[in-house]
Amino acid sequence: MKVTLIAILTCAAVLVLHTTAAEELEAESQLMEVGMPDTELAAVDEERLFECSVSCEIEKEGNKDCKKKKCKGGWKCKSNICVKV
């Protein structure tokens, strides 16, 4: 009974790890498309860095506060730099 339970839990853990690794590879393959040279990827990274580090310089309109730009599309803002999630 214990051996069966351990085997089932081990298989479940391997399946979860395999699925996570497959998702990461799929995301990387989408970024590294054949038609997209490294210079374009660098431009995307610079753009994301800019998006995250720009503070709000627009004056308030009425009662609305302006908002900082945020990182999007699988990136998060950390220490004013967009990093891949």
Swiss-Prot record:
It is found in: Secreted. Residues 23-48 form a propeptide. It comes from the Eukaryota. Expressed by the venom gland. Keywords: Disulfide bond, Neurotoxin, Postsynaptic neurotoxin, Secreted, Signal, Toxin. Transmembrane segments: none annotated. Residues 1-22 form the signal peptide. One of its GO terms (molecular function) is toxin activity. One of its GO terms (cellular component) is extracellular region. Disulfide bonds join 52-66, 56-77, 71-82. Postsynaptic neurotoxin. Belongs to the neurotoxin 12 (Hwtx-2) family. 02 (Hwtx-2) subfamily. This is U4-theraphotoxin-Hhn1s. It comes from Cyriopagopus hainanus.
